[in-house]
Curated annotation (Swiss-Prot):
Transmembrane segments: none
The organism's place on the tree of life at top rank: Bacteria
Function summary: Part of the ABC transporter complex NodIJ involved in the export of the nodulation factors (Nod factors), the bacterial signal molecules that induce symbiosis and subsequent nodulation induction. Nod factors are LCO (lipo-chitin oligosaccharide), a modified beta-1,4-linked N-acetylglucosamine oligosaccharide. This subunit is responsible for energy coupling to the transport system.
Organism: Sinorhizobium fredii (strain NBRC 101917 / NGR234)
Main location per the UniProt record: membrane
Protein name: Nod factor export ATP-binding protein I
GO cellular component: plasma membrane
Length: 343
């Protein structure tokens, strides 16, 4: 078992390791284009034309994507888009109705148990035993994977160190903060030294400091060559962590690509948010100077490559508040899935 130590887990990794398949250096959001050929050993997860229905409801519809070993791949979509079902399919907890799934070289669900032995899962809601200490929870998770006492004695201290919980090792989970509990859940997912991590909303409910600490820990895992499948509603999280991402709705893939490339392709200009006026009326004023305008409640979103002209048209109007900013991944997500509320 490879142990996580201060020597091989950098607290501030400068870049991802080089991929053998890519034969190039990877910086920031750069990664191989999905069209490049990969050897089987370089593919962590592959879904090909996968469909899944429950009764008359199609939850996953002819979905295909490939995740390269060592990358963070984001799966984004509104509530009910099918993200949780995709995770269950990848883990072999539900069989597909159509299509094929390969995880870490194993056909799923036929050899799902073998694949799962090399996977760590961080669920949306913690499954920690609140009466047990941090150390005892790690012991319990280790037993699930059949690890012996000696192996656990070697593995647990570095994991507590990784999660920055060394001083809380013998404190009951109920007495830990939300951020500490989330880091402990991540440590539990690493107890079997997995090649692949599946993360479901890993920072939901955390304050900004705790969230950034989780992100820093996840980046250190990527620097070690771990593969991550991330489902999240938090667009900043996807932008910071993901090499590539896929947006799905009603179980179908809408778009796939690198975060910054998708922002350029789907938005490509500044965004001006306009508050305090009648958005329908203002649309006719700024519309001729915008590539696109959208109304959400009492807010007008103006997408323009000439934002100064938009500001000029609104000059002198009282009661208006303008926020000009560069486009972000949330703009892409809302453009593709709509701004209306979804349950």
């Amino acid at each position: 078992m490879q142990l996580l130590t201060r020597a091989n887990v950098s607290s501030s990794p400068s870049r991802r390791p080089e991929s053998n398949a890519l034969k190039q250096k990877c910086h920031g959001h750069s990664n191989a284009d999905n069209s490049l050929s990969r050897s089987k050993s370089d593919v962590a997860i592959e879904l090909t034309n996968v469909s899944k229905s429950y009764g008359d409801k199609v939850v996953v519809d002819q979905l295909s994507f490939t995740i390269t070993s060592g990358e963070c791949f984001g799966l984004l979509g509104p509530n009910g888009a099918g993200k949780s079902t995709v995770s269950r399919l990848v883990l072999g907890l539900a069989p597909p109705d159509e299509g094929t799934i390969t995880v870490l070289g194993e056909p799923v669900p036929a050899r799902a148990r073998l694949a799962r032995s090399r996977i760590g899962v961080v669920p949306q809601f913690d499954t920690l035993d609140r009466e047990f200490t941090a150390r005892e929870n790690l012991l319990v998770f280790g037993r699930y994977f059949g690890l012996h006492t000696r192996e656990l004695e070697e593995a647990i201290p570095p994991l507590l160190d990784f999660a920055r919980l060394e001083s809380k090792a013998d404190v009951p989970v109920a007495q830990l903060s939300g951020g500490m509990q989330r880091r402990l859940t991540l440590a539990c997912a690493l107890i079997n030294d997995p090649q692949l991590l599946i993360l479901d909303e890993p920072t939901t409910g955390l304050d900004p400091h705790a969230r950034h600490l989780i992100w820093e820990r996840l980046r250190s895992l990527l620097a070690l060559g771990k593969t991550i499948l991330l489902t999240t509603h938090f667009m900043e999280e996807a932008d910071r962590l993901c090499d590539r991402l896929c947006v799905i709705e009603h179980g179908r893939k809408i778009v796939e690509g690198r975060p910054h490339a998708l922002i350029d392709e789907q938005i490509g200009c500044d965004v001006i948010e306009i508050y305090g006026g009648n958005p329908r009326e203002l649309t006719s004023v700024v519309g001729p100077y915008a590539q696109r305008v959208e109304v959400s409640g009492e807010t007008l979103f103006c997408y323009s490559s000439d934002p100064e002209q938009v500001r000029l048209q609104l000059r002198g109007r009282t009661g208006l508040r303008l926020l000009q900013r560069p486009p972000n991944l949330e703009d892409v997500f809302l453009r593709l899935t709509g701004r209306e509320m979804k349950d």
